[in-house]
């Protein structure tokens, strides 16, 4: 196999997984659906030509994102939640339908329904009572959002109708904000000075995936208000062995009789042409529907054909999503500004008159680089054509030349970094993008890296978001930022946070907000006015307590507490937070599991790094290059000095985690459900640290299954195969003392 094919496949895998993590974990869309599908199809082609490239965890074999946040307990779906394959033209849809009818050996009926742009949810009912609600996650395990789901008016807690109800049934659907409710939400956010949501899907995901714990009464009321604006429509079933109906449309009728909300827009058609006509009509009236839609889902209506046609590892063959081309509007290009991201890339952004497109208001869009600006032919002051690529990402298509009046002017790419003044330059010869080479101290790059450290894919620090990162790295006062680099992050003190003042900026344009008198608005995020309950200022007190006027705010105290807790986060999260190029959650987990410590990773050769399953040559080169830079090593030294743990306790050493050297040497253990005292990732790391293999599925080779509440098919499989099942307490004994310390199994 050619080395370039392997390198291309590794690069595609890394990028696709990064995009999935951004979409499913961070509620962020980085590329259009068409571009994502192009990358996925290319990876499928490479794996077809070179079967040895395909692995079980390849993006071509998996669904969704990894349910890796620590905010919610993991829930295993009784039946996998698959994704859908996409088509973008009538020709592609007709080709899919022709294959369906060829494989079925007869003409089929098609159920067509509007594709809701929302958050996929799985509702589990037992004997008619809602027991759990979970996000899709990776299709096998999602996040438990049951308590939040109960606040959504459309979701029934107990099925109605005559019954009898099945012992267990999973109902799948989409949670979304109706267009009107989304507009109300953003209006409230703007009035409160809060960041507005980019689109309704982000808002739905962000509202559903929040915790009430730690919030004050006002915050909890706001949270319940958001949840109360959400709606849900169900569009399928999961685990239900023998539904008493013969068609998918019949399933919907049954679900409606149980009091569950289904779409009023679905129709069954007997020919491909009728289905195609429905797709066309729905596109014309998409703005009249209560919720955002980005296409039509077409399903074979007959349930028996679902079994006959089957599914791939990630999508059913009996259904397809027809994705609409994005909507286009005209608006005024007011300016082109350049921003610098955490990698140093200088990116021009179009600042426009606010305009509504594809369901949300837009004021800015990326222009990528100076060559793209030139190729599009846009001038500052132009009326431009704007669309949302994939109905999500704002994209300037070009100018309306006939509307020019002579006042327009060309954009000139700055020669120096707008943030630190360093001359911009390509990273290497031939690159189009310009970058700021001052990676260590450029405040915009430091801000981006600090924000990445706090992200869900990094250390998952709730108090270290966009606002806190900007305050720590680019304050108005003091002149010297508390964090000139991220090296000092874990050494921050209340005294460092207390004096910080920041300019309040518009969440969309990044421009300073002004008071009525035209002065920039200023905020002090880490202090508040002293109140009677705080007591008098004591300058002799040992603990820092502010000054006579103010005390540290809750945000300051929470940030420091979160940072203390983050010092002992799993090694793979620490690795991601170091901002090593190409080292996302997948590669970081592989490196952490294999080597067990940062010292061992640092000491490894290129061949040793590249040989690790899930790493490869591209990541290996990036890791070695990262450690060659002196200030990177200073970050590690400072973090270690401030208590960050760069090793998995008890790990037997490089390559020995699953081959010997621990109490679970040679044993395979599966953890499923909510194990008390363990997150999903912590349970897996405990198995690996003890020398065992942490498997994701149960088989005859499995030695133990640790199961907590919410365990599903894995528990049933273990009982079927006679594999010993442990509770959380027994699991702790197993990983700490080994199987010999477990109590005898009662006969």
Curated annotation (Swiss-Prot):
According to its UniProt record, which residues of this chain constitute the active site?
115 (n6-amp-lysine intermediate)
What CDD domains is this protein classified in? BRCT_DNA_ligase_like (cd17748), LIGANc (cd00114)
Q: Name one GO cellular component term.
A: cytosol
**Residues reported in the UniProt entry to bind NAD(+):** 33-37, 83-84, 113, 136, 174, 299, 323
Q: Which GO terms describe its biological process?
A: DNA repair; DNA replication
UniProt record similarity statement: Belongs to the NAD-dependent DNA ligase family. LigA subfamily.
Protein name, please? DNA ligase
